[in-house]
């Protein structure tokens, strides 16, 4: 997916880049796989903001993606590669031989006309989904399950891939895109290959308005707030923060603090992430 740059005809265009979308083969989505998507604007069921800087954005439909890949042993043909506004990856429309249609994440190298299949007897080929037990060591995988039958929850964004490093007993060892090395139950499903749309990380939005189209509202610096609103706030003019380390809006350390609190799954992590 090459990235297109513009001539600097305006301040917003000067640093803007967009995808060429040349891998997209179908503009209109499959209507039978669409669902309404209601905007939350970062609010929970009480109406309180739980995620800041969210709201607005272009109206979207949700594309129902098959993360489980549970249609075992039934081949499907790739009918189209489509754009999905709800994720960084592209999606592939599959037509199964029994007439069913499903969307999956489009891996790098999957083209219209290719045949994919899921199950323990599937070939080791891009787009096929197999249990980790059946996948050779060193293979790149994505859309990895953490619990058998629950569907893939890891390694799903554009350009992501995990590497299968070892298999021992009931667990397989994976090196994640973050550098974390963790164990996963060996019967969990994973899809062969790397998620496509690799150049997503090279796109520059160029202007604040384009961020608003994505549903992101402005982030205000703590130093620009009043002292009642942020520990860094207040002072006459530009004032130092007045503390040795930066704090969050709620007074907690903002740098170098572990944010993971799930001791139940700690034994499955062999090495912490490096970035």
Curated annotation (Swiss-Prot):
Extent of Basic residues compositional bias: 249-262
GO cellular component, one term: large ribosomal subunit
Gene Ontology molecular function terms on file: rRNA binding; structural constituent of ribosome; transferase activity
Biological role stated in the UniProt entry: One of the primary rRNA binding proteins. Required for association of the 30S and 50S subunits to form the 70S ribosome, for tRNA binding and peptide bond formation. It has been suggested to have peptidyltransferase activity; this is somewhat controversial. Makes several contacts with the 16S rRNA in the 70S ribosome.
Name of this protein: Large ribosomal subunit protein uL2
Annotated keywords: Ribonucleoprotein, Ribosomal protein, RNA-binding, rRNA-binding
Species name: Roseiflexus sp. (strain RS-1)
PROSITE patterns recorded: RIBOSOMAL_L2
UniProt region (Disordered), positions on chain: 220-275
Organism superkingdom: Bacteria
